[in-house]
């Protein structure tokens, strides 16, 4: 890798590396084995020399999933002995990187449940507090002045904390057992679904005491995540992780990195007065033709119904706004709208954050070759 990346760009690349199992179909053991084999070279090539795998990767599939389904969650921990931060300090650094949705359609478990299952919520501090992380409680009607998150998000965060990779220990136990050098930093990051789960997991592990060895040195770098919970959860997140860095750039910690033209960070707030809310989605790219407008309005109605079924007002986390390249003209039909959504949700972030730097790809073709060779 010839380009020198700043710390934010390196963390961004580590996040992208967690997505290498995108649309890969195999058993969890096969997936874990092939990701583990590819990660070391990937980290060096794209994030830079010195990065290595400290834990994982972990691969999780829901009960009933087959080998012909992609993984539901992939996550790992990378470490570097000496990373230069934006303030000039040089610190040993651990990064928890969480994959985006790995299914290639909207029918996969991670899309349908973890991403869009927002109709039920749970009291966040009922499962993560006071030195313990337990299975999340059953959903309940939200109570004022308490932090609530989507049950689907909470269940996934619990999986990330408590599910062990084959042959290893759970992430929470790994962090508890670590003996980092003084001044070491711990960073949570992820894109899309990972952008929802990274702040949720960071809060859970922190309030439960599993990151105490990084007290004052834990950072979060979520990328284009939807809203995980209500205002009180957002306040809890901000209290634990105050924003720091340049406003309205990618160089800012503890805020959601948001492309103004990306629909995903507009989820799941329904308050039309908010900067980020579902009502914005049909208008992101100008005036649509009637058929496309009707189509998009119907989608937004369905999304609103999911959000309001929770009985709670979802509220975005603090964010840093960037702006992807605007389309030269409004999309002409629903297919073009979806294509623009896809571009603004992925490639636009790469261009703003990384410029011309290359990015990690999927192992899908490699998985296909290996599986064919075994037939």
Task: Please report, for each region that a protein language model flagged, where it lies by residue.
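N-terminal low-complexity, Ser/Thr- and acidic-residue-enriched intrinsically disordered segments
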Residues: 1-102
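Gly/Ala-rich beta-loop-alpha elbow adjacent to hydrolase catalytic centers
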Residues: 190-194, 198
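Serine hydrolase/lipase
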Residues: 1-12, 156-187, 203-375
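Short, glycine/acidic-rich beta->alpha junctions
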Residues: 69, 197, 229
């Amino acid at each position: 890798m010839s380009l020198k990346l700043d710390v934010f760009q390196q963390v961004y690349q580590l996040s992208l590396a967690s997505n290498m199992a995108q649309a890969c179909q195999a058993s969890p053991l096969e997936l874990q084995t092939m990701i583990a084999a590819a990660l070391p070279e990937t980290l060096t090539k794209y994030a830079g020399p010195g990065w290595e795998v400290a834990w994982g990767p972990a691969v999780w599939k829901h009960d009933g999933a087959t080998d012909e389904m992609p993984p539901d969650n992939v996550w790992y921990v990378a470490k570097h002995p000496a990373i230069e931060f934006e303030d000039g300090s040089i610190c040993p650094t651990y990064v928890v990187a969480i994959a985006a949705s790995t299914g290639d359609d909207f029918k996969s478990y991670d899309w349908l449940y973890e991403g869009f299952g927002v109709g039920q919520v749970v009291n966040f501090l009922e499962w993560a507090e006071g030195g313990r992380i337990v299975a999340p409680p059953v959903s309940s009607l939200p109570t004022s002045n308490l932090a609530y998150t989507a049950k689907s998000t909470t269940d996934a965060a619990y999986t990330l904390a408590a599910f062990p990779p084959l042959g290893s220990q759970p992430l929470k136990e790994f962090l508890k057992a670590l003996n980092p050098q003084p001044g070491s930093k711990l960073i949570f990051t992820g894109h899309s679904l990972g952008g929802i789960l990274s702040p949720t997991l960071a809060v859970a592990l922190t309030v439960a005491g599993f990151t105490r060895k990084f007290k004052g040195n834990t950072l979060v770098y979520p990328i284009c995540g939807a809203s995980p919970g209500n205002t009180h959860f957002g306040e809890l997140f901000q209290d634990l992780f105050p924003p720091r860095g340049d406003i309205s750039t990618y160089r800012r910690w503890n805020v959601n990195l948001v492309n103004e033209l990306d629909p995903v960070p507009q989820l799941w707030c329904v308050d039309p007065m908010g900067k980020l809310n579902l009502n914005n989605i049909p208008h992101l790219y100008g005036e649509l033709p009637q058929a496309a407008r009707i189509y998009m309005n119907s989608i937004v109605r369905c999304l609103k119904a999911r959000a309001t079924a929770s009985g709670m007002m979802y509220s975005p986390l603090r964010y840093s706004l960037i702006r992807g390249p605007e389309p030269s003209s409004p999309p002409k039909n629903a297919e073009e709208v979806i294509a623009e959504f896809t571009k603004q949700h992925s490639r636009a972030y790469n261009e703003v954050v990384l410029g011309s730097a290359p990015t990690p790809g999927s192992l899908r073709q490699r998985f296909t070759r290996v599986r064919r060779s075994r037939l």
